[in-house]
């Protein structure tokens, strides 16, 4: 689907503290709590979006959980979890069943498992 031509369609459940702006599609069985969805964007079915910001030109496939994080201009494939990320994720492609989370381990360090022909930009 071309996101810039998307129409507003909310099949999921948005609580009273969440808001949508622009063309936003939310699939059936998806729950959105205390979050901002700024379109154009699409969120698939059976997703959980909590305490998060989903920005424009983002496609989120089915069964994705995003908590306490921000993402825009990105594609997130099915069954991913993005949780407690302190910096906005942008211009990213995240594969199936990927888990991105803030580590509580010390000493603090970046840890990567990266596939062939990939690019990783770090702060």
Show the residue positions of the predicted features.
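Left-handed beta-helix
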Residues: 1-123
């Amino acid at each position: 689907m071309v996101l810039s031509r998307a129409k507003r369609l909310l099949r999921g459940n948005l609580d009273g503290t969440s808001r949508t702006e622009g063309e936003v599609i939310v699939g059936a069985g998806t729950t959105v709590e205390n979050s901002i969805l700024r379109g154009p964007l699409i969120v698939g079915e059976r997703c959980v979006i909590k305490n998060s910001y989903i920005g424009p030109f983002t496609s989120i496939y089915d069964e994705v959980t995003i908590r306490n994080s921000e993402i825009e201009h990105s594609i997130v494939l099915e069954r991913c979890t993005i949780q407690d990320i302190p910096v906005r994720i942008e211009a990213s492609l995240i594969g199936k069943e990927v888990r991105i989370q803030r580590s509580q381990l010390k000493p603090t360090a970046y840890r990567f498992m990266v596939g062939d022909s990939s690019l990783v930009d770090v702060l």
